[in-house]
């Protein structure tokens, strides 16, 4: 089954989508009421009145403020002690109606933001998507003060003060612990630099017709947010009469005297994918180590340089017989001939770590279709120096790099981005800084390599990224962010998959 992912939109695209719905007959008040109800249901579920009885709602002058006022009203009806702060004289008509009704119900409005200091949770509805001007003066000062308070802050759609396309801070912005994004993901929420203000992103759908989305985005490159649909990308269905040679053959190449553990981590991760045959090519001196830890693999010892890197691949190793080759973990920059040989192989490739650094010196562009590059931003800058600083932000840069190189480019980071050669983009909104340690990328390379040996490149890429991140999140729950070392991460791969599949039944 082909996964379907929620779209990521710009401000102009979201305005076109909402405009089409309104032109089709949906009353604006009806949409505001629906959105407010869904927001209040989320808040009641995650901030119950037993633990968070006192709620502050910051209401702006526009429809984001109207949504906030509906939330305030609904929480008030459900027994929460609500205080409203709306520091604006001029309101949009619909927002003014909701403010008037809130006063009629007796909800208390406070004049000064300091009056909110004793609440248990803060709901930010000052500004939504489309804000362009910088926040200054007393409003900016109030936001800065709110950011110093210890209570959890929940923003409606976009943290107030954050640009919804670029993720830039417009003077100042609410530092949200959670952002409840309405309808479709806004591009700016997924920019890596915006994450300290976005916190945990949660999509709150409000039933946008798929035909409206398709029409509005028909001429634009597609941008998607990964979600649980990624589990459908894994090669879980097998014929009852299959055999190992029909389940993919993966060649892993890497390791050195300096980085002996990297290729071992990749191999341990790769075998979790169920790949039929796993062959690992390492320096001769590492062969016994890898074989002792991965006895089900065929381990090929390679001639070494004096410093313990692979000098060349051995004669008789037929690269064309493999379904996929993953090259790079622990390789070292000495292995130029290895990468040059791999690039001539007529099979699917994953290139990581020093294979990328060597690739930057070889410049064999464009790459064979379906090649997967997995750089972090430092490696990306070495690979594509002409794009850095000239092609917009990182999301624009990764799209430009994929188009130029003819590869799938996976830019690792707090919000890992995947771009295809046709210019489509996928972003993983869920990850953890617990992965910021040596070896995490080696695990990802093994995962993607094992999946690539069994299926097409794009599915292998986003399936591997999602699986890797979800296993890390689960490991973090048990071991804290300090305990998600690579072997712990690998140990959680199959239990995470099993629980995800059980939840789908």
Curated annotation (Swiss-Prot):
The keyword Metal-binding applies. (6S)-NADPHX 1 binds at residue 157. Residues 14-214 form the YjeF N-terminal domain. It comes from Thermosynechococcus vestitus (strain NIES-2133 / IAM M-273 / BP-1). (6S)-NADPHX 2 binds at residues 330, 442. Bifunctional enzyme that catalyzes the epimerization of the S- and R-forms of NAD(P)HX and the dehydration of the S-form of NAD(P)HX at the expense of ADP, which is converted to AMP. This allows the repair of both epimers of NAD(P)HX, a damaged form of NAD(P)H that is a result of enzymatic or heat-dependent hydration. In the N-terminal section; belongs to the NnrE/AIBP family. In the C-terminal section; belongs to the NnrD/CARKD family. One of its GO terms (molecular function) is ATP binding. Gene3D superfamilies: 3.40.1190.20, YjeF N-terminal domain (3.40.50.10260). Residues 226-500 form the YjeF C-terminal domain. This is Bifunctional NAD(P)H-hydrate repair enzyme Nnr. Residues 63-67, 128-134 are annotated as: NADPHX 1. GO terms for biological process: metabolite repair; nicotinamide nucleotide metabolic process. Its cofactor is K(+). InterPro entries: Carbohydrate_kinase_pred_CS (IPR017953), CARKD (IPR000631), Nnr (IPR030677), Ribokinase-like (IPR029056), YjeF_N_dom (IPR004443), YjeF_N_dom_sf (IPR036652). It catalyses: (6S)-NADHX + ADP = AMP + phosphate + NADH + H(+); (6S)-NADPHX + ADP = AMP + phosphate + NADPH + H(+); (6R)-NADHX = (6S)-NADHX; (6R)-NADPHX = (6S)-NADPHX.
């Amino acid at each position: 089954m082909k996964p379907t992912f929620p779209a990521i939109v710009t401000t102009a695209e979201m305005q076109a989508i909402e405009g089409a719905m309104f032109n089709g007959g949906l009353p604006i008040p009806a949409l505001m009421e629906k959105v407010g109800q869904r927001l209040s249901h989320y808040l009641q579920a995650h901030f119950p009145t037993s633990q968070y009885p006192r709620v502050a709602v910051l209401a702006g002058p526009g429809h984001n403020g109207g949504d906030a006022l509906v939330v305030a009203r609904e929480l008030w009806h459900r027994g929460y002690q609500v205080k409203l702060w709306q520091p604006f004289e001029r309101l949009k008509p619909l927002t003014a109606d909701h403010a008037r009704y809130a006063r009629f119900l007796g909800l208390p409005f406070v004049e000064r933001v300091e009056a909110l200091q004793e609440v248990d949770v803060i709901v930010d509805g000052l500004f939504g998507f489309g804000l362009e001007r910088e926040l200054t003066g007393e409003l900016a000062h109030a936001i800065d003060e709110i950011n110093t308070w210890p209570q959890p802050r929940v923003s409606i759609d976009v943290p107030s003060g954050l640009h919804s396309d670029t993720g830039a801070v417009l003077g100042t912005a609410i530092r949200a612990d959670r952002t409840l994004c309405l309808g479709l993901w806004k591009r700016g929420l997924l920019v890596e630099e915006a994450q300290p203000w976005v916190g945990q992103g949660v999509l709150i759908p409000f039933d946008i017709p798929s035909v409206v989305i398709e029409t509005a985005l028909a001429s634009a490159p597609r941008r998607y947010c990964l979600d649980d649909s990624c589990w459908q990308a894994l090669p879980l269905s097998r014929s009852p009469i299959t055999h190992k040679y029909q389940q993919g053959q993966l060649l892993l190449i890497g390791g050195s005297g300096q980085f002996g553990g990297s290729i071992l981590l990749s191999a341990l991760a790769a075998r979790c994918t169920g790949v039929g045959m796993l062959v690992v090519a390492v320096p001769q001196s590492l062969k016994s180590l890898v074989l002792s830890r991965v006895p089900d693999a065929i381990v090929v010892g390679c001639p070494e340089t004096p410093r313990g890197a692979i000098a060349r691949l051995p004669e008789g190793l037929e690269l064309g017989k493999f379904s996929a080759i993953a090259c790079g973990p622990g390789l070292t920059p000495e292995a130029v001939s290895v990468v040059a040989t791999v690039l001539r192989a007529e099979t699917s490739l994953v290139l990581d770590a020093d294979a990328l650094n060597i690739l930057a010196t070889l410049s064999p562009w464009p790459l064979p279709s379906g090649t997967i590059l997995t750089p972090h931003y430092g490696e990306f800058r070495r690979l594509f120096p002409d794009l850095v600083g000239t092609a917009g932000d990182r999301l624009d840069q990764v799209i430009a790099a994929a188009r130029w190189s003819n590869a799938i480019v996976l830019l690792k980071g707090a919000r890992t981005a995947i771009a295809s050669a046709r210019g489509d983009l996928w972003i993983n909104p869920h990850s953890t800084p617990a992965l910021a340690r040596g070896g995490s990328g080696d695990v990802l390379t093994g995962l993607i390599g094992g999946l690539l040996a069994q299926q097409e490149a794009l599915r292998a890429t986003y399936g591997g990224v999602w699986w890797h991140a979800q296993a890390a999140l689960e490991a973090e729950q048990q071991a804290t962010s300090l305990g998600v070392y690579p072997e712990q991460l690998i140990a959680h791969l199959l239990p995470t998959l099993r629980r995800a599949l059980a939840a789908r039944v």
